[in-house]
Amino acid sequence: MEETQDSSSSKPKNTDENFSLWIEQYFNHKCCITFLTGCYSCQWQYREWEKTELGSCCCSRKEQFFYMCLVIAFILSVLFLFVWVETSNEYNGFDWVVYLGTGCWFFWSILVLSAAGIMVAYTTLLLLLGFLLLWERIELNLHTSHKVFICLVIVLCSFLLAVLSHFWKDKWLIAGLSLQIFAPFVHLSLITVMIIISWPLSICVARLESEVKVRRYRMADYEQEIQERCNVFQRLRALQIAAGLSFLIILLCLYLMPLGIYSPCILKKENLGPKPTLFGHRGAPMLAPENTMMSFEKAVELDVSGLETDIYLSFDSVPFLMHDYDLTRTTNIKEVLPSAAGNHTSNFNWTFLSTLNAGKWFLKHKPFFGMKPLSEADKRRAGNQSIPQLSELLALAKREQKIVIFDLFGPRPGHPLRNTFVRRVVKVILDSKIEQRLIFWLPGFDRDYVRFMAPGFQHVGRLWSIKDLTKHNITIINVDYKRLFYAGLRDYKEAKIYIHVYVINEPWLFSLAWCSSINSVTTDNIELLNQLSRPLFFMTPGFYMFMWLFLDIASAVIIGFVFCYNWIKEIKRERWLEAAASSGLLHSETITDITENNDASQQKPEVAPTSANLAPENMIELQKTEPKTENL
């Protein structure tokens, strides 16, 4: 019985021992080095790597060149990812443009975003692996496949950035706007990053200083190499100054960064204007097929202030709601009349247009990424939608007292209403008996006639000068948000111009509009923007000042402590060196023992010790063994 108990009690011990052995076997320094070299150089066989000396080149010229290429690839990929993430408000428009060129609806914007994220992750991982290998003082040897992929990343990112600069210059404007609102938080985050970086940097700077002093001891025994070693000292000092001074300059720039920051969302609470009212862009296109009565009714249910749409006139003079110049994307014309699918929207009679289905496409191809799933009732309702007339929208707006704003597209040459389409639309509006104040009249053609026939319409201008707006007696502007913030927003506010911007879907952009005292916005994302009770990233000047000074002082104290701690640690190593030198411990046999105890690279006995080899724990072992040698 006792033997049985002993054997049963020994099982957990054996299990623990086996687990410890397993941990030691697979999670040790050798395995770590093998993993790093395997990922970076595809060399998965462990061997004793020859370590480079501090102050010497870490790799060949060729490897230095490709490491610089890696840094360039990282910068380009991060830049492209930043621009693309910040332009998420424009993803639907990008997908629509690609659809016009390819005829295939797909979330191309998300595909590009995924590719950018993969490139950033890939280059970041390679940079991290290279840094860890340099930290271990192992010579870099990037695998050929990585070199090819790095070149592809540089070419692809350069091409995509060039395309953005040529075809979508306004995307850079969005990136600039994002910096306005995110700059205070980027500043605070970067200071935190600098605190993290200070730890390895302080170790590096202190180790370089210690390395210089260690090599000075070596010069006493190798006087013939003094000239050569002086060059090494210069390189070590240069590395030390370059690393420390660069860090200090960047840190000081970050400390002073708030002096150059302008963010509309840093203002006093009493200066924050009311929340901008929302206009449904073609209704509520995230909840129902765009420009259908279901879409506008959904927008009304969400309590929007206005409804935005697009108007064409059929060949038999009926104004109807449609955005595209053809019917292929939002109707089933390819099934009903494939031969005429590419014809212009205004070339059809209303008798034919009224028979088309305008909702099935919405169920097949979601227009927005991340849309909520529809209920079964909404699916059935959406699948039965048709193209609505303008009169139907006006009846809804009249009943619910909602503002109506629209883009009016003129007919093509040969259309019966080629020159009188504005008058036809005005007649339809007046016949609906809707209050004229609820019409935001945007079209600029035949405006004098409109003023005469409907003096109650609220005329809306574009991004005109204050002088032109005053000349035409216009107090409302409808502008692209990307252009407005760079075109003298303050001047329009001082002139008491009502500002309406389009199309804003992202909360951070809506917060920017709110902090800038914009009156109303057109949006696809009504539900999300309705939930905002205050602007995102809003801060009072006093709170930001407190955070700025507090983080600056705290970071300076922490960074100073980190540098002092690692510096003192290296000073202790130097004292052990002096004690060892004065007691005669530093001869060739002792140096060899130190090297072996620290798993250093295999060196000849004549090679001098480095700061890493002269750790206090090694010197303790030496003190135990060395006196015997001296007595002999």
From Swiss-Prot:
Residues 596-632 are annotated as: Disordered. Pfam families: GDPD. It is a multi-pass membrane protein. GO terms for biological process: lipid metabolic process. The chain crosses the membrane at residues 65-85, 115-135, 148-168, 181-201, 241-261, 543-563. It is an enzyme of class 3 (hydrolase). It is found in: Cytoplasm; Membrane. Residues 1-64, 136-147, 202-240, 564-632 are cytoplasmic. Residues 276-533 form the GP-PDE domain. Residues 86-114, 169-180, 262-542 are extracellular. Coiled coil: none annotated. Residues 623-632 have a biased composition (Basic and acidic residues). Keywords: Cytoplasm, Glycoprotein, Hydrolase, Membrane, Metal-binding, Transmembrane, Transmembrane helix. Glycans are attached at N343, N349, N384, N473. A divalent metal cation binds at E308, D310, H323. Detected in testis, in particular in spermatocytes. Its EC number is 3.1.-.-. GO terms for cellular component: cytoplasm; membrane. One of its GO terms (molecular function) is metal ion binding. Belongs to the glycerophosphoryl diester phosphodiesterase family. This is Glycerophosphodiester phosphodiesterase domain-containing protein 4.
